[in-house]
Amino acid sequence: FHWYSSTGWVMWNIQVGGLLSGTTICLFDGSPSGTRDKPDWTRLWSFAARNAVTWFGAGATFFSACQKAGVDLSEIDGLAQVRALGSTGSPLPPDVQRWGTAQFDALGKPDIWWCNVSGGTEIAAAFMAGNPELPDTPGRLQCRHLGAAIEAWDDEGRPVVGEVGELVCTRPFPSMPLYFWGDDHGARYRESYFAQWPGV
C-alpha cells in the first residue's frame, strides 16, 4: 500500500493505519516529480513498480500533472500488479481519471478501480470514498462511508441529487474536531464549520 503524502496530511495517518490490518506500506521520501532541472513524473510510478505496490494513491494534482506531462505508464515495467488507484485532496477531473484508466488498460488492467476520497486532515477520516462493488464513474465519488450522514446541498440548504452541491455532514460523528488550537472561545471553529447553515 502506498499513498504519496507528507506526514502533515491525513493520508499519512491512513497509510500508517494500514499496518493495523497487516498491510505492508511503502514509504517514498522525495519529490514525486524529479528535480527542477530534470523533471520526471515517472519517479513515483517507478517506485511503485519496484516495490510491487498493489494499491497506489496520491493527490488529484499528481495524476493531473502526470497526464499533462504525457507520462506513458507502459514504459514502466511492473505496474500491472496495481489493483487500485486512490485520489483525494481535490476533485479528480473526469478526463484525468479516464486518462489513468486508459494507461492501465494498456497494461492489461481495463477494470482498474479508482477510489476517489473526500475527507479531511482535521477529521482524520473520510466522509465519502469507494466501494469496488459499485459502479466507478469518472468525476464522481462512489458512496458515503458507513455512519457518515452526508448530503449535497444547494445554496438554499436543500438536499440535491444528481447536481452540484456543497458537501454537508448533517449529524455529529466520532472523529469530528472539538475545537481549534488557540481558538479559546470557539469563534473560528463555529465560523469554519457551522456558520453557513445554522443548526447543522
Residue ranges: model-predicted function:
Residues 35-39, 60, 199:
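Conserved phosphate-coordination/catalytic loops
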Residues 44-51, 73-76, 131-135:
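Short, hinge-like loop/turn segments at secondary-structure boundaries
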Residues 1, 7-54, 69:
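Conserved AMP-binding/adenylation subdomain of ANL enzymes
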Residues 41, 60, 79, 174, ...:
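Alpha-helix initiation and N-capping motif
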Residues 83-85, 92-200:
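Conserved AMP-binding/adenylate-forming
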Residues 20, 50, 79-80, 109, ...:
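Short, well-ordered coil/turn elements that cap or connect secondary structure elements
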Residues 6, 29-32, 51-99, 115-122, ...:
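Adenylate-forming
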Residues 40, 77, 142:
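Short acidic-hydrophobic sequence patches enriched in Asp/Glu that either
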